[in-house]
Amino acid sequence: MGFSSIWHWIIVLVVVLLLFGAGKIPRLMGDVAKGVKAFKKGMADDEDDEAASVSAERRGIEDGKPAQTIYPPQQPQQPQQPPQQPPVHRDDAPRG
């Protein structure tokens, strides 16, 4: 007895209607549709951005100019010396 019986699907449908109500289901489906549309739009925007960057790279190659890599400015680093500890003076004279 799997979920291939029509009675199982009717029971599932009734439970879903009882949990969410008849008015909430269309709103949920509308929200899902909006989410899918936003996802597709985002994917299309990413593809457009990628295509624009590829075409910009090709224009640079077509112009005969090598692509320039911009590096952030770096501060010169000076070698650090380990901290010097002050010498320890012992008093060799016996105490007492």
Curated annotation (Swiss-Prot):
InterPro entries: TatA/B/E (IPR003369), TatA/E (IPR006312). It is a single-pass membrane protein. GO terms for cellular component: TAT protein transport complex. Keywords: Cell inner membrane, Cell membrane, Membrane, Protein transport, Translocation, Transmembrane, Transmembrane helix, Transport. Coiled coil: none annotated. It is found in: Cell inner membrane. Residues 73-86 have a biased composition (Pro residues). The chain crosses the membrane at residues 1-21. Its main location: membrane. Residues 56-65 have a biased composition (Basic and acidic residues). Pfam families: TatA_B_E (PF02416). The keyword DNA repair does not apply. Residues 42-96 are annotated as: Disordered. GO terms for biological process: protein transport by the Tat complex. The keyword Glycosyltransferase does not apply. One of its GO terms (molecular function) is protein transmembrane transporter activity. Belongs to the TatA/E family. Part of the twin-arginine translocation (Tat) system that transports large folded proteins containing a characteristic twin-arginine motif in their signal peptide across membranes. TatA could form the protein-conducting channel of the Tat system. HAMAP family: TatA_E (MF_00236). PANTHER family: SEC-INDEPENDENT PROTEIN TRANSLOCASE PROTEIN TATA. The Tat system comprises two distinct complexes: a TatABC complex, containing multiple copies of TatA, TatB and TatC subunits, and a separate TatA complex, containing only TatA subunits. Substrates initially bind to the TatABC complex, which probably triggers association of the separate TatA complex to form the active translocon. This is Sec-independent protein translocase protein TatA.
